[in-house]
């Protein structure tokens, strides 16, 4: 976009966020800084991005008619999916019928809404290296896939994120409960799953890849620690060989070029020595990229905002060893944070509290961030800051 309007005026540049969690909140803030009129939608009220948007809507984004009605009402210049649980076929239809601009493209949103579309594209169409895998619909197919792939392996619903419904199978005793959890823990309820073999990797990274008007740019690789498929810590830069980094960039460019459009992609990769395997890709900012709030001059959210608006990204500057640590809450209630001051007493630390309206079970409610002389020091400082904050859940 060569021109940007003024919010809440006839000239406004309107962006509709489909999904209003903590990542969408940071995108909304960056768009606000550029004078964009932001509309946030999600399935529940008072979601984090709604708190910083010009207005918001509560809808079931898997409901095709509700999604069409919202887009017709708001007439956005850009639709920016921030989660997977969206009726993406509607976006494809509106893109074809009306020229609706979906970020990065409606096809990319549809392919990445579940693990099957993107895995088949990566492995079967593009020939990228991946773990061995099978897709299954029934418990019998699941058990046959586990037997064929062997233990250890991982089972995940094809439509889920942040570890929901995901289990690691290490013994025969894990097989039955893992299937049960996969059928109850995913975003879209019971259904199709992927069974993946284990890769004996040294570490895993997220390579934030930005497609923009000037070409494709890469952020420094981000290392991360996962537990039960969910992000716990991330750090940047992750040390890796020049050969492995070149291969990671090659794989990331291949998958993002095929998906097309403009915006930031989070490409997840496994690395062992100089070998690299494709794991997953999200066509939007990535939770492990929260570290870029302190590790880069332009965070992943600022990069996404610039890219989707067609603005230049002449350089991506990394600020040195940095780390993030997720702040977790368990139970039921409204989060209340104690000892935030203690977490901020160490120089070069920061805290982001997401503003999630409630917790039901297990939820990430904030993140601590740190810069230091080394990655190990930054990780330790971020962990200590997270430990210092007590999360209390009130009725």
Curated annotation (Swiss-Prot):
It catalyses: N(1)-(5-phospho-beta-D-ribosyl)glycinamide + formate + ATP = N(2)-formyl-N(1)-(5-phospho-beta-D-ribosyl)glycinamide + ADP + phosphate + H(+). Mg(2+) binds at residues 268, 280. SUPFAM superfamilies: Glutathione synthetase ATP-binding domain-like, PreATP-grasp domain, Rudiment single hybrid motif. Residues 120-309 form the ATP-grasp domain. The keyword S-adenosyl-L-methionine does not apply. ATP binds at residues 115, 156, 161-166, 196-199, 204. It is an enzyme of class 6 (ligase). One of its GO terms (biological process) is 'de novo' IMP biosynthetic process. PROSITE patterns: ATP_GRASP. The keyword Repeat does not apply. N(1)-(5-phospho-beta-D-ribosyl)glycinamide binds at residues 22-23, 82, 287, 356, 363-364. HAMAP family: PurT (MF_01643). Belongs to the PurK/PurT family. This is Formate-dependent phosphoribosylglycinamide formyltransferase. It comes from Stenotrophomonas maltophilia (strain R551-3).
């Amino acid at each position: 976009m060569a021109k940007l309007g003024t919010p809440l005026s006839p000239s406004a540049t309107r962006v509709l966020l489909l999904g209003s969690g903590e990542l969408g909140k940071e995108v909304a803030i960056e768009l606000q800084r550029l004078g964009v009129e932001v509309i946030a939608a999600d399935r529940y009220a008072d979601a984090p991005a709604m708190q910083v948007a010009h207005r918001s809507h509560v809808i079931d984004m898997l409901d095709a008619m509700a999604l069409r009605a919202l887009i017709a009402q708001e007439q956005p210049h850009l639709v920016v999916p921030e989660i997977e649980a969206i009726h993406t076929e509607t976006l494809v239809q509106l893109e074809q019928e009306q020229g609706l601009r979906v970020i990065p493209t409606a096809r990319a949103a549809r392919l990445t809404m579940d693990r099957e579309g993107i895995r088949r594209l990566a492995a079967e169409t593009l020939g990228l290296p991946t773990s061995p895998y099978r897709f299954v619909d029934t418990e019998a197919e699941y058990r046959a896939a586990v037997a064929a792939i062997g233990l250890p392996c991982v089972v995940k619903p094809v439509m889920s994120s942040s570890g929901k419904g995901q289990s690691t199978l290490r013994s025969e005793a894990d097989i039955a409960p893992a299937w049960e959890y996969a059928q109850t823990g995913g975003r879209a309820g019971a259904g199709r799953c992927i069974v993946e073999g284990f890769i004996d990797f040294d570490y895993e990274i997220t390579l934030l890849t930005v497609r923009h008007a000037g070409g494709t740019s890469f952020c420094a690789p981000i290392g991360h620690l996962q537990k039960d498929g969910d992000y716990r810590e991330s750090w940047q830069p992750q040390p890796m060989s020049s050969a492995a980094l070149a291969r990671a960039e090659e794989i990331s460019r291949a998958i993002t070029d095929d998906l097309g459009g403009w915006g930031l992609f989070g490409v997840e990769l496994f690395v062992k020595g100089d070998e690299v395997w494709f794991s997953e890709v999200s066509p939007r900012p990535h939770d492990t990229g929260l570290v870029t709030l302190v590790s880069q001059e332009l965070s992943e959210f600022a990069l996404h905002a610039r890219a989707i608006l067609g603005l230049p990204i002449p350089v991506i500057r990394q600020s040195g060893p940095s780390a993030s640590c997720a702040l977790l809450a368990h139970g039921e209630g409204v989060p209340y944070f104690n000892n935030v001051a203690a977490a901020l007493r160490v120089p070069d630390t920061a805290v982001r509290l997401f503003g999630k309206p409630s917790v039901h079970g297990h939820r990430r409610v904030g993140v601590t961030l740190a810069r230091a002389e080394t990655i190990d020091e930054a990780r330790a400082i971020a962990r200590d800051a997270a430990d210092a904050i007590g999360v209390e859940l009130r009725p």
